[in-house]
Protein backbone atom coordinates (compact mmCIF):
# COMPACT_ATOMS: atom_id res chain seq x y z
CA UNK A 1 0.00 0.00 0.00
CA UNK A 2 1.49 3.33 -1.03
CA UNK A 3 1.38 6.44 1.11
CA UNK A 4 -0.94 9.31 0.27
CA UNK A 5 1.33 12.04 -1.10
CA UNK A 6 -1.45 14.53 -1.85
CA UNK A 7 -1.56 15.66 1.81
CA UNK A 8 1.07 17.34 3.95
CA UNK A 9 3.01 15.14 6.37
CA UNK A 10 1.49 14.79 9.83
CA UNK A 11 3.79 17.19 11.74
CA UNK A 12 2.83 19.99 9.37
CA UNK A 13 -0.87 19.05 9.57
CA UNK A 14 -0.70 19.11 13.39
CA UNK A 15 0.87 22.59 13.45
CA UNK A 16 -1.58 23.84 10.83
CA UNK A 17 -4.57 22.52 12.80
CA UNK A 18 -3.21 23.99 16.03
CA UNK A 19 -2.85 27.41 14.41
CA UNK A 20 -6.28 27.28 12.79
CA UNK A 21 -7.97 26.23 16.02
CA UNK A 22 -6.13 28.96 17.94
CA UNK A 23 -7.27 31.57 15.42
CA UNK A 24 -10.88 30.38 15.60
CA UNK A 25 -10.85 30.44 19.38
CA UNK A 26 -9.19 33.85 19.54
CA UNK A 27 -11.64 35.41 17.07
CA UNK A 28 -14.58 33.82 18.85
CA UNK A 29 -13.13 34.99 22.16
CA UNK A 30 -12.89 38.56 20.91
CA UNK A 31 -16.56 38.51 19.93
CA UNK A 32 -17.80 36.66 23.03
CA UNK A 33 -15.74 38.44 25.66
CA UNK A 34 -16.15 41.80 23.93
CA UNK A 35 -19.92 41.54 24.21
CA UNK A 36 -19.68 40.16 27.73
CA UNK A 37 -17.29 42.92 28.87
CA UNK A 38 -19.46 45.57 27.22
CA UNK A 39 -22.63 44.37 28.95
CA UNK A 40 -21.03 43.94 32.38
CA UNK A 41 -19.44 47.42 32.50
CA UNK A 42 -20.96 50.65 33.83
CA UNK A 43 -22.44 53.06 31.28
CA UNK A 44 -19.44 55.36 30.90
CA UNK A 45 -16.87 52.56 30.82
CA UNK A 46 -18.39 50.11 28.33
CA UNK A 47 -15.73 50.50 25.64
CA UNK A 48 -12.80 50.15 27.99
CA UNK A 49 -14.56 47.32 29.84
CA UNK A 50 -15.00 45.43 26.58
CA UNK A 51 -11.34 45.97 25.64
CA UNK A 52 -10.03 44.83 29.02
CA UNK A 53 -12.21 41.70 28.89
CA UNK A 54 -10.96 40.96 25.38
CA UNK A 55 -7.31 41.41 26.38
CA UNK A 56 -7.71 39.23 29.46
CA UNK A 57 -9.80 36.32 28.14
CA UNK A 58 -9.64 36.04 24.32
CA UNK A 59 -6.04 34.68 24.21
CA UNK A 60 -6.96 32.10 26.87
CA UNK A 61 -9.91 30.88 24.82
CA UNK A 62 -7.72 30.80 21.70
CA UNK A 63 -5.15 28.71 23.57
CA UNK A 64 -7.81 26.29 24.76
CA UNK A 65 -9.12 25.85 21.23
CA UNK A 66 -5.55 25.47 19.94
CA UNK A 67 -4.73 22.74 22.45
CA UNK A 68 -7.88 20.85 21.52
CA UNK A 69 -7.17 21.19 17.78
CA UNK A 70 -3.51 20.20 18.09
CA UNK A 71 -4.25 17.23 20.33
CA UNK A 72 -7.08 16.04 18.07
CA UNK A 73 -4.86 16.30 15.01
CA UNK A 74 -2.06 14.43 16.79
CA UNK A 75 -4.39 11.58 17.73
CA UNK A 76 -5.93 11.59 14.25
CA UNK A 77 -2.51 11.17 12.63
CA UNK A 78 -1.62 8.43 15.13
CA UNK A 79 -4.85 6.54 14.46
CA UNK A 80 -4.32 6.83 10.69
CA UNK A 81 -0.81 5.43 11.09
CA UNK A 82 -1.98 2.51 13.22
CA UNK A 83 -5.10 1.61 11.22
CA UNK A 84 -3.53 2.38 7.80
CA UNK A 85 -6.84 3.57 6.38
CA UNK A 86 -8.64 6.85 5.90
CA UNK A 87 -12.27 6.79 7.06
CA UNK A 88 -14.64 8.55 9.49
CA UNK A 89 -13.78 6.12 12.30
CA UNK A 90 -10.36 7.77 12.60
CA UNK A 91 -11.93 11.07 13.65
CA UNK A 92 -14.29 9.36 16.10
CA UNK A 93 -11.44 7.41 17.72
CA UNK A 94 -9.24 10.53 17.80
CA UNK A 95 -12.10 12.46 19.41
CA UNK A 96 -12.42 9.75 22.05
CA UNK A 97 -8.71 9.98 22.90
CA UNK A 98 -8.73 13.80 22.81
CA UNK A 99 -11.67 14.08 25.19
CA UNK A 100 -10.04 11.62 27.56
CA UNK A 101 -6.62 13.24 27.44
CA UNK A 102 -8.02 16.69 28.18
CA UNK A 103 -10.07 15.40 31.12
CA UNK A 104 -7.53 13.02 32.68
CA UNK A 105 -6.80 15.38 35.60
CA UNK A 106 -10.44 15.20 36.68
CA UNK A 107 -10.40 11.53 37.61
CA UNK A 108 -11.50 8.28 36.02
CA UNK A 109 -15.24 9.07 35.83
CA UNK A 110 -14.70 12.50 34.27
CA UNK A 111 -12.20 11.04 31.79
CA UNK A 112 -14.64 8.32 30.73
CA UNK A 113 -17.55 10.73 30.33
CA UNK A 114 -15.50 13.27 28.38
CA UNK A 115 -14.12 10.57 26.09
CA UNK A 116 -17.57 9.25 25.28
CA UNK A 117 -19.03 12.74 24.84
CA UNK A 118 -16.25 13.85 22.51
CA UNK A 119 -16.49 10.64 20.46
CA UNK A 120 -20.26 11.09 20.12
CA UNK A 121 -19.81 14.72 19.08
CA UNK A 122 -17.28 13.73 16.42
CA UNK A 123 -19.58 10.90 15.31
CA UNK A 124 -22.40 13.38 14.74
CA UNK A 125 -20.08 15.74 12.86
CA UNK A 126 -18.79 12.91 10.65
CA UNK A 127 -22.34 11.64 10.05
CA UNK A 128 -23.55 15.07 8.95
CA UNK A 129 -20.50 15.39 6.69
CA UNK A 130 -21.25 12.03 5.05
CA UNK A 131 -24.89 13.02 4.61
CA UNK A 132 -23.89 16.23 2.82
CA UNK A 133 -21.41 14.32 0.63
CA UNK A 134 -24.10 11.86 -0.45
CA UNK A 135 -26.55 14.66 -1.12
CA UNK A 136 -23.98 16.52 -3.23
CA UNK A 137 -23.19 13.32 -5.15
CA UNK A 138 -26.90 12.77 -5.74
CA UNK A 139 -27.27 16.35 -7.02
CA UNK A 140 -24.37 15.89 -9.45
CA UNK A 141 -25.73 12.58 -10.77
CA UNK A 142 -26.07 12.73 -14.57
CA UNK A 143 -29.64 12.63 -15.86
CA UNK A 144 -30.85 11.10 -19.11
CA UNK A 145 -32.35 13.54 -21.63
CA UNK A 146 -36.16 13.44 -21.92
CA UNK A 147 -37.57 11.01 -24.46
CA UNK A 148 -39.20 12.54 -27.54
CA UNK A 149 -42.97 12.29 -27.76
CA UNK A 150 -44.39 9.45 -29.80
CA UNK A 151 -45.77 10.53 -33.19
CA UNK A 152 -49.55 10.73 -33.25
CA UNK A 153 -51.60 8.68 -35.70
CA UNK A 154 -53.88 11.61 -36.63
CA UNK A 155 -53.24 13.25 -39.99
CA UNK A 156 -52.11 16.85 -40.10
CA UNK A 157 -54.86 19.35 -40.90
CA UNK A 158 -54.24 22.14 -43.34
Swiss-Prot record:
Q: List the disulfide bonds.
A: 10-77
Q: Name one GO biological process term.
A: mitochondrial genome maintenance
Its membrane topology: Multi-pass membrane protein
Give the record's GO CC terms: mitochondrial inner membrane; mitochondrial intermembrane space; mitochondrion; TIM23 mitochondrial import inner membrane translocase complex
Keyword Transmembrane helix among UniProt keywords? yes
Where does this chain mainly localize?
mitochondrion
Q: Where in the cell is the protein located?
A: Mitochondrion inner membrane
Entry comment on modification after translation: The disulfide bond is required for stabilization of the TIM23 complex.
Q: Which residues form a coiled coil?
A: none
Membrane topology, Mitochondrial intermembrane segments: 1-11, 76-87, 134-158
> Could you tell me one molecular function GO term of this UniProt entry?
protein transmembrane transporter activity
- Tell me yes or no: is S-adenosyl-L-methionine among this UniProt entry's keywords: no
Signal sequence span is none
- What interactions and quaternary structure are annotated? Component of the TIM23 complex, at least composed of TIM23, TIM17, TIM50 and TIM21. The complex interacts with the TIM44 component of the PAM complex.
What is the recorded function of this protein according to its Swiss-Prot or TrEMBL entry?
A: Essential component of the TIM23 complex, a complex that mediates the translocation of transit peptide-containing proteins across the mitochondrial inner membrane.
Q: What's the miscellaneous note?
A: Present with 1210 molecules/cell in log phase SD medium.
State the family it belongs to: Belongs to the Tim17/Tim22/Tim23 family.
Q: What is this protein called?
A: Mitochondrial import inner membrane translocase subunit TIM17
Organism whose genome encodes this protein: Saccharomyces cerevisiae (strain ATCC 204508 / S288c) (Baker's yeast)
Amino acid sequence: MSADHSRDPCPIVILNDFGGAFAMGAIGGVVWHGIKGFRNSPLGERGSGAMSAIKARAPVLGGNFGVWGGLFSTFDCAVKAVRKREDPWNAIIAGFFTGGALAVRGGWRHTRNSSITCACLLGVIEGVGLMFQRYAAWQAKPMAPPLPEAPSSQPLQA
